[in-house]
Amino acid sequence: MSDDRGALSLARREGLPDALRVLVAEYPRECWEGHRNLTALMRFWLERHLIFRELEAALLAETRGLLAGDREPREFAAQLARLGNAFLGDLQAHHGIEDLHFFPRLQRLDTRIATGFDLLEADHHEIEPRLQALAERANALLAAIREGAPTADGAGRLEAELLRLQGFLDRHLTDEEDLVVPVILANPDADLD
């Protein structure tokens, strides 16, 4: 799904609509960490989100290092392959688990926010082409490095793609957290296994 979602598209959305913020109003972020209903599974899930943000930031820093001449191309290539594979593979697996297992169960817990999980799944479809473009830019740059070709243009394209994805991904992860964590806090007996 792409920008046909209008104002709810990741490209345009500045946050969840008010109708989907009812539970985060009851359970604001400030209370999550110490809340008795924040399960080990939720802590793990939030940690995964942090890791995705950190991996993307590391990819951007490495790319900027190459552009600035602070990174030797072969060292950069090894880091790009390692970080890129972890980021893309883990994020796609994470989204798959959410779409097939997690969201359908959460959707049934509170009808007031049920459509929010459809929105999050649509986000995954909107993010997927950005992930594909990132992989293509990274692979093109890796090929240039292997061939000993100049890297500035390829690194610039990779940086631009990382910046595009960063906005989409941060908006999605933040909105996802604002839906998922409060519904779990409000429903401590929810079966997510």
Question: What annotation goes with each model-predicted range?
Answer:
Residues 1-193:
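Small-residue-biased structural context
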